[in-house]
Amino acid sequence: MGETEGKKDEADYKRLQTFPLVRHSDMPEEMRVETMELCVTACEKFSNNNESAAKMIKETMDKKFGSSWHVVIGEGFGFEITHEVKNLLYLYFGGTLAVCVWKCS
Amino acid sequence: CLLFLFFFQSLNMGRGTRKRDEDSGTEVGEGTDEWSQSKTTVRPPDQLELTDAELKEEFTRILTANNPHAPQNIVRYSFKEGTYKLIGFVNQLAVHFSQVGNLIPKDSDEGRRQNYRDEMAAGSQESVKVVLSDTENLEEDEEPKEAEAEAEAEAEAETGSQIDVPTVEAVETVPEEELMTPRQPKERKLTNKFNFSERASQTFNNLLRDRDCQMEPPPRTNFSATANQWEIYDAYMEELEKQEKTKEKEKAKTPVAKKSGKMAMRKLTSMESQSDDITKVTQAAKIVERMVNQNTYDDVAQDFKYYEDAADEYRDQEGTLLPLWKFQNDKAKHLAVTALCWNPKYKDLFAVGHGSYDFMKQSRGMLLLYSMKNPSFPEYTFSSDSGIMCLDMHMDHPYLVVVGHYDGNVAIYNLKKPQTQPSFRSTAKSGKHTDPVWQVKWEKYDDMDHNLNFFSVSSDGRIVSWTLVKSELVHTDVIKLKVEGSTTEVPEGLQLHTVGCGTAFDFHKEINYMFLVGTEEGKIYKCSKSYSSQFLDTYDAHNMAVDAVTWNPYHAKVFMSCSSDWTVKIWDHTIKTPMFIYDLNSAVGDVAWSPYSSTVFAAVTTDGKAHVFDLAVNKYEAICNQPVVAKKKNKITHVQFNPIYPIIIIGDDRGHVTCLKLSPNLRKMPKEKKGQEVQKGPAVEIAKLDKLLNLVREVKT
C-alpha cells in the first residue's frame, strides 16, 4: 500500500514538476525569460543527453548574446563560478535537473 | 639524356628540300583527304616558274642509311700486313643536332637520386637558403651528396653513362637543371621545362605600429551553489506549496467560496480587526488631542467657567465681553463666516458655514463643526465647490445640517456618515434656486408623513419648502415674492411682476403657518404658508437690504430686524411701525435675541463691533459696545448666543470665529428683593417686555 502510494507520489511529483524553477538569476527580465525558455527547450529535446542539451544552450546563447557562455546541466553538482554580472541564470527543471548558465569571457 | 639523330640523303638536295617544304602539307592532303578540304596553294613570291612538263617530271628520292659525305676511300697502314690497305668499313654516323634534355625518368637512378636530394633539402635546409643559393653552390652541394650516395648507385651511374654519348656536353646543362629542381614544390611534381616560367617582384612591407588602450573589464561576481536531488525536490515542493496558498487566497477572495468559507471568514475578520485598529488609534489620538488642548487652553476654560468681571459691580449698567477661544482653520482661510449655528443637543458644538459675501470673489465653501473642547481643530470638515451662505441644524436630529449655497443649491450633510459629500442635494432638475440661498431653516414640525422638511429663501424671490422623501429632496414653492405696486399690465392681459429678493426669514414660534421674510428692498413681509399669492402684512422696514429678521423667543408678537442701513428695529407684528430703532453707525450684519432674557439681544456691525442691548436696563443705547476683532478691516458677519452658557460666538469675514463671554451686567436678572422669591419663566419675561412695549405704544398712541 505504502509502496504504491510512494509510486503515485513520485508520478505526481514528476507530473507536477515540469515547470522550470529559477533559483537564482541576475539577468534582465527579458533575457531571463528567453534563456529560461531555451533551457526548457534544450532539456526537453535532449531529455536523455545532458551534454547535448548543454551544447545546444551554450551555442544558442553564444549566438544570441555574444560569446563565452558556459552551461552546466546535471542532477547533482556543486560549483563556484565567476560570471559577468547580469549574466547568470541558475534554475531547476523537470524535478531532477539543475541548469546553470552564465557568461564569462 | 635523349639523343636524336636524323639522316637525310637526297639525290638533289638544292631543289629537293625546297620542294618538300612546299608540298609536305598538301601532298598528304591530296593523297588521303581530298574531299574534306579545298586545295589552297600558298606560293612564296620568289617561287620558280616551272612549266607543266617540268612540274610533271618525277624525281626519285631515296632515303638511305649511308652517309653520302662519308669517305669511301680511307686507306690506313696495316702493321700486320705491312702495307696500306683500303678500309671497307666506314662509320656512317653523322651528328647534325644535339640537345640535352632535363627530364629524368622517375625510375632511373638519377631520378631516384634527385628525389632523395630534394627530400634531404626539404628536411634539413631552410627554403630561403635553397632559393638564394647559387648554381655553383648547388654544384658543390651536389657533389658531396653524390659522394654520399650509395656506391652501387654510383657504379651503376658510371656504367650507365657509357650509353650516353654526350655526357661531357651534358655537364653544361646540369646547373640549370639543378637550379630548377630545388625550387619545385614538395609534392615532387616535376615542372614542365618547356612552358614553365617564373616571375617575382618585391614590394615594400607596410610599417607596423602598436597602439593599445586599457578599459575596465566587465564587472564580475562569484556565484556558488550545490545542486543535488534533495535540494531540487525541496525547492519544487516549496514552490508548489506557495502556489497552493495563492490559489487558496484567490478562493478566499471570492465570496462564493463555500468550503474555504471559514478560512475566508477568519481572514476577513482579521482584516476587519486591522481596520478597527486604525479607528482605535484615531479614538486614542482624539483623546490625546483633547487632553493636549485641555492643557493648552486651561486658562481659557477656567475663564469660561468661573471668571466674572468684578468691575461690573462698579460700572453700573454697562457690561463687557471677554474673549475666550478663537476658532480658525487653514483650509477656511480667507473664507468669510457666512453662517453660525449652535448644535441643539451638544451645547459645546457649533457649525460654521464659510463662503463669501463678495459678489466678485466667489470661490469654494466649507462647512466646519467646532467644539469648545477642541478649539484648535474642527470636529467635522466638509468642502463644497460653491460657497455656503447659510445653515441650520435640526432640533430633533442634531446630526442633520442643512446648508444653502451661493449657486442656489441646498444640501443636507449627515454628520453620522463619514462621507465628505452631502447626503442630499438639490439639483437644477429638482427646483434649486437660481440665486444665492440666503437662509435655510428646518421646520420644527414634520409633515403628516413624518418626513423632515425645511424652508429656504433666495434672491430669486421664491420661498421653497423642501421635503426629505426617502432618498430625495422634493420641493414645493411656498410663495413668490412680488414687489407691491410693481405689477405692470401688458396688452395680452398678462401680469408681469418684479420679484422681491428674499434675504432672511423666520418662523413664528407659536403660530405655525406664519413667518416673516426680509427682502433686499428693505421690506419685510408677513406671510402664511397657506397663501402663496398674498402677504398677510408688509412692513416698510428698512432702506437697504434686510440682513436678519428674528422673532423674540419669549414674546410672540415681537420681532427684530436689522439691515445694512445701519439700523436695528424692533417690531410688534401687529403694528406697522417699529417699536424701537437703534442706529449703530455701521451696517448691521446680524442680530440675535438672547435665550435667557426677552429684553437682551446682540447686534454686530461691519466696523468690527459687537453691541449688546438690554432693553430692561437701557432702552436707548447698548449696554455693551465693544470692538471684538483685532483689525479694523475685519468685518463681523454673524453672531449667535449659546443656548445655555453666557457666551456668544462671532464670525468675521476672515474666517475666524471668536467666542466671548458676557459679563454679569449683560445678563443681569431682576434684583432679588428681600423675602420675595424671584419669579422666573417665560411669563415673567413676556411681562417684562410687554411693560416696555406698553411704554412705547402709549407714546405712539
Curated annotation (Swiss-Prot), chain A:
Matching SUPFAM superfamilies: DLC
Domain of life: Eukaryota
One Pfam family, short name: Dynein_light
CC terms in the record's Gene Ontology section: cilium; cytoplasm; dynein complex; microtubule; plasma membrane
Any GO BP: microtubule-based movement
GO MF entries: identical protein binding; microtubule motor activity
Coarse class of the protein's main subcellular location: cytoplasm
Keyword tags: Cell projection, Cilium, Cytoplasm, Cytoskeleton, Dynein, Microtubule, Motor protein
UniProt xrefs under InterPro entries: DLC_sf, Dynein_light_chain_typ-1/2
Annotated compartments: Cytoplasm, Cytoskeleton, Cilium axoneme
UniProt family annotation: Belongs to the dynein light chain family.
Subunit relationships: Consists of at least two heavy chains and a number of intermediate and light chains.
Known role: Force generating protein of respiratory cilia. Produces force towards the minus ends of microtubules. Dynein has ATPase activity.
Clinical note on disease: Mirror movements 3: A disorder characterized by contralateral involuntary movements that mirror voluntary ones. While mirror movements are occasionally found in young children, persistence beyond the age of 10 is abnormal. Mirror movements occur more commonly in the upper extremities.
Protein known as: Dynein axonemal light chain 4
